[in-house]
């Protein structure tokens, strides 16, 4: 059994405002992230993602950073982090992040018209984060070559489904009765 699947089956589930939320090293930083799990995930991303001609990896803070940093190190593709803090630098673009449990503004720098980007994220659940990111990247004029999320939580509304983007995932899960259920071990794409 692969490490990602087992780590999800072992993940504790909490309820946050009537939303069942799994707590996982990739999405939450707890329990601690073991290097062999991160290595497995990075290798699977590199095998699944369309990387040819990608100029930049784009990821949201905070939980996409560790995954994307490791992918950047393995591929020599530069990394851009979409942050929750505004710096007011030239070319900074703001975007709205609306998830199942929060709403916030995020900011992107160093992505320009014509850039070819790979978007990486930890979890695809409501699609709010990825919808905001893809909208901002389109507004900038960047070309989104591929989008990969490590884990997809199925069920419920997913804002990215209403877009022209297909998100690849490594594994798809659901949460029922406070337990993680594996829906598709191979994910999407």
UniProtKB/Swiss-Prot annotation:
RNA-binding among keywords: no
Keywords from the named record: Purine salvage, Transferase
EC number of the protein: 2.4.2.-
TM region positions: none
GO function term, MF aspect, one: transferase activity
Function: May catalyze a purine salvage reaction, the substrate is unknown.
Xref: HAMAP family: Hypx_phosphoribosyltr (MF_01467)
Name of the molecule in the record: HGPRTase-like protein
């Amino acid at each position: 059994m692969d490490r990602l699947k087992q780590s999800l089956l072992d993940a504790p589930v909490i309820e946050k405002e009537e939303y069942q939320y799994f707590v996982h090293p990739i999405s939450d930083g707890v329990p601690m992230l073991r290097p062999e799990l991160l290595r497995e995930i990075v290798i699977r991303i590199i095998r699944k993602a369309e990387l040819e001609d990608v100029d930049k990896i784009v990821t949201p803070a905070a939980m996409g950073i560790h995954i994307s940093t490791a992918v950047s190190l393995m591929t020599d593709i530069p990394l851009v982090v979409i942050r929750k803090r505004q710096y007011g630098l030239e070319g900074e673009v703001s975007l709205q992040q609306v998830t199942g449990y929060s709403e916030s503004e995020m900011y992107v720098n160093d992505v320009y018209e014509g850039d070819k980007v790979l978007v990486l994220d930890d979890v695809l659940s409501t699609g709010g984060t990825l919808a905001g990111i893809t909208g901002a990247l389109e507004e900038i004029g960047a070309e989104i070559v591929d989008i990969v999320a490590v884990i997809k939580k199925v069920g419920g509304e997913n804002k990215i489904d209403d877009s022209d983007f297909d998100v690849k995932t490594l594994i798809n899960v659901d949460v029922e009765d406070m337990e993680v259920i594996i829906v598709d071990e191979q994910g999407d794409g």
